[in-house]
Amino acid sequence: MIMRKKVLIIDDEVDLCLLMKSYFLRKNYEVYIAHTLADGMNRLNQIAPDYLFIDYNLPDGLGWERLPEMYQKFPHTHFHLISAFRPTMPDDLDGSKLTVWEKPISLKALDHFF
């Protein structure tokens, strides 16, 4: 049996989540969505996704602040930070493990990556 790759999207913008979910379902990924950092962390621990998309600014915290912890716990996950602006990342955050996407994310741009 072929295992489908898993994608977790943590973003409070419902429309963006639905668009990305539709995109990844068409590519035969399993897709999970969370709209808060707390819910996203719970889902992350439950499913250990292959790909994580996390919004920079969520209602209950800043997504990038949790990235070092996520890197350690999930070293095989590919991390993608979503932001409405090009953020300045802290020096202690390993940018080599991270792809930054600026909103709005185009499906064409995703096609170049996935």
Task: List the model feature ranges, each with a label.
Residues 82-84:
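Hydrophobic/aromatic residues positioned on beta-strands within the core alpha/beta folds
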Residues 33-51:
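Acidic, metal-coordinating helix/loop segments flanking the phosphotransfer/catalytic sites
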Residues 11:
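Conserved acidic carboxylate
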Residues 55:
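Active-site residues of response regulator receiver
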Residues 64-76:
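Short amphipathic alpha-helix used as the core "switch/output" element in two-component signaling
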Residues 14-32, 98:
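Two-component/phosphorelay signaling modules centered on CheY-like receiver
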Residues 105-114:
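C-terminal output helix
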Residues 36, 62-65:
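Acidic catalytic/metal-coordinating carboxylates
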